[in-house]
A protein has these predicted regions:
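C-terminal binding/interaction regions
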Residues: 2-31, 37-41, 45, 50-148
């Protein structure tokens, strides 16, 4: 894939909402939210952000590459842990300002806490309490990342 001029210029509303050209809208920080979901189960795995270059890299290699807002660097998911996310499909919303990545999660999980999903708790309706939703740890993050 040619990495230059990958994305179409943003056109009018009709072109953005109904057209056949991918022209993502990045926010004022140059980022677009990307929700990774298991391609088979549709379970939400994690929410991360991409900049233009990380999205290009993702399209080129077929694996999720994010932009780390805290470290200010590219984050090839699984480069350290081996828990890569193979891209099955990328969807964009009507405004092309948010992405859903349907992925094949390789390895024990997507979450740095050792769980398959970062969404392992739910808010009890009408309260501010959280309850676990089956988020047992599937790997030891200290062993994988070398951090306590």
């Amino acid at each position: 894939m040619d990495t230059q001029n990958v994305f179409a210029p943003r056109g009018g509303k009709a072109e953005i909402e109904e057209g056949a050209e991918f022209s993502p809208k990045f926010d004022s920080d140059g980022l677009i939210p990307a929700m990774a979901m298991d391609a088979t189960t549709r379970e939400p795995l994690m929410l991360a952000y991409m900049n233009e270059e990380s999205l290009r890299r993702t399209l080129e290699i077929g694996e999720a590459v994010y932009w780390s807002r805290s470290r200010k660097e590219f984050w090839h998911k699984g480069a350290t842990s081996g828990h890569i996310q193979k891209i099955v499909e990328i969807r964009t919303d009507c405004d092309q300002d948010a992405l859903v990545l349907l992925v094949e999660q390789i390895g024990a999980g997507a979450c740095h806490t050792g769980r398959n999903s970062c969404f392992y708790r739910k808010v009890v309706p009408g309260t501010t309490k959280l309850v676990m939703t089956g988020g047992a740890k599937s790997f030891d993050p200290a062993a994988v990342y070398g951090k306590p």
